Amino acid sequence: MSQARPATVLGAMEMGRRMDVTSSSASVRAFLQRGHTEIDTAFVYANGQSETILGDLGLGLGRSGCKVKIATKAAPMFGKTLKPADVRFQLETSLKRLQCPRVDLFYLHFPDHGTPIEETLQACHQLHQEGKFVELGLSNYVSWEVAEICTLCKKNGWIMPTVYQGMYNAITRQVETELFPCLRHFGLRFYAFNPLAGGLLTGRYKYQDKDGKNPESRFFGNPFSQLYMDRYWKEEHFNGIALVEKALKTTYGPTAPSMISAAVRWMYHHSQLKGTQGDAVILGMSSLEQLEQNLALVEEGPLEPAVVDAFDQAWNLVAHECPNYFR
């Protein structure tokens, strides 16, 4: 059971791809009007268009008095590494696109196993000393790497990471076993991405859909489709969702919440996220309508115990083939 409701962060991955400037701008406004303040983007999202769109909104990001917090990431992909020069290039390019002097949170998007981590961390510390970001974050690192990084930073007097962004939802709970205790020990808060398992937990898909023609989504018609298919498109996942849908109908009858409502409420009320420790859920979207629906669901209350039990049964069905939280 969650302790106090986790915060909500706006995931900007689809800005500049499935969302144009107008819908992106409207989504940011809708998000901020509900009292949320943090936006998450990355150097690689939509080939830089996500950051560019956010920078053009005139939010005054990274400046004194700005209530909106912005996070971005450097990644070892598309010809880049996490060597010092590439980390600097990515962050400084992100700052130009975002039109801000500094970001509130700068992540290492995932590990670069070809670069000694000490080199990357020292480069991050230098960039922090230059005032180019406030907090350091990690994403997609295995728990022993997190422990190693925290130990190295403490030993060398470098900036310590304070946030970890990882994959977590009702049917993807690998992070609970070893990563969460590690993060609590070192004082990192956890930001969950894929809270709806790429859309699988909306309940709108059937296993057989993989063989037909489908509208564009995380699973179909985009550069990351195969990644998401490999993560979540397994028969046991659909069997688990059916268990939850049955429990919803049995427990609530004709007024049963939707599958997506149940999945969002599980994240905010029944997961291991703790609002008191600064944990958060990253909500992405492919349209303004979808975002407004999900933001309304965030404000709903806890689920009945029978539905929480059904989510646990679903997790037990799929745990053996849970995708790794690290790369």
From Swiss-Prot:
Residue positions of the active site: Y45
Any one Pfam family match given in the protein's UniProt record, by short name: Aldo_ket_red
InterPro entries named among the record's database cross-references: AKR, AKR_Detox_Biosynth, NADP_OxRdtase_dom, NADP_OxRdtase_dom_sf
Cell location: Cytoplasm
EC number: 1.1.1.2
Any Gene Ontology CC annotation: cytoplasm
Catalysis performed (reactions): a primary alcohol + NADP(+) = an aldehyde + NADPH + H(+); aflatoxin B1 dialdehyde + NADPH + H(+) = aflatoxin B1 C(6a)-monoaldehyde + NADP(+); aflatoxin B1 dialdehyde + NADPH + H(+) = aflatoxin B1 C(8)-monoaldehyde + NADP(+); aflatoxin B1 C(6a)-monoaldehyde + NADPH + 2 H(+) = aflatoxin B1 triol + NADP(+)
Family: Belongs to the aldo/keto reductase family. Aldo/keto reductase 2 subfamily.
Protein name: Aldo-keto reductase family 7 member A3
Taxonomic lineage of the native organism: Eukaryota, Metazoa, Chordata, Craniata, Vertebrata
